[in-house]
Amino acid sequence: MDYRNGLRRFNTDRRSRLFPSSAFGFLLALMLFSLAGLLPWKQWFVLEGNWKNGEITSAVGKLYDKEHPARNYAVGLWALVSYTLFGEGQKGLFVGKDGWLFIKEELEPSAHEHQEVEAARELIEIVKSHFAENESQLLITVIPAKWRVVPENLGEKEIAPDIALRRSYLLDAFSNKQAVGQQDIAVFDAYETMRDLGEKAFLRTDTHWTPQATESVAERLSQSIRQQFTDLSYDQTSFEWQRSDPEIFRGDLYNFLPLGRGLEMFGPSPDLIETKQLVLTHEAINGAINNTENILFDGLSFPVNLVGTSYSANERWHFADALQKSLGMEIPNHAQEGKGPFQPMLEYLVSEEFIESPPELVIWEIPERYMGVEGNQKVLEEYRSKQS
């Protein structure tokens, strides 16, 4: 049974029954009546912005920060009208078809797009140079943008050329050798795998992929690794999934729709996300007990390490777990949330763990959108300041 589609149909039908188009006028009148009593009239004549890009909602929120404790209720009403009448959320959110939400930094060039791309390229060259100086090998896993996997859910939204080129920029950065001694960099592009999954690849209300997508990507990535890196010790242990019932999940993009309690039912339907846990099989547990003496004398060895973003760091998606299961080995996870792909890698390369015991292979997960978003120049400047 497709739980996500079932929940979507249920909530869509429910909204159509509870909130028909004939009620829009009533809602608008109620909202204006409520807010008129809470804000001085003179404040309404200084509101600047555009309904359709969320600026009015943000402006009302700022007024309530200063004027009245009923801010959450008022802003929730404004957000509801903006979403239901205009199909828009707060600034930073794009509302697609059938309740699909997208973050605008994936759809629109940043203020300094070209400079951020150049900074990303330089950071990549720095990382490549580090690996050229040691025996560890690097494998890049490119995560496609959400819009690229489900473009049909964008509606009439057009993608700017700079945005469409981000994936090519990233792939090209690892195919070019700009320094003497740089080794070939293995690249796994997850686009085909995720495109095959269609709407099951990404969560509708979140920027991230689904647990089903991480399993599929990890399986195909593991096949590629086994073919390219034949000397690694695979299948040293065995894992299995303990699966539970799906849970209702409201993703991070709900933050751009501050409907508040009581109004969420009129917003996009939440996702249903698979819940599971990776555990050792009974055979693996028995084997670990028998090998305890060898581990004590020889120490632990982890031939593969993972570095990346919240796509790998957040345990809700289970990417690191899926890789461990597919490769049959424990994989230390150095991914971090909220830092993009470059900062965690630079920190890992100077860590005691990497310097004293470099692994045979490092998997570096990079979402394509980070080639142009704000922040790459800052990471590069901080790196340069530490080197000087």
Regions found by a protein language model. Give the residues of each.
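Extracellular glycan-modifying ectodomains
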Residues: M1-S388
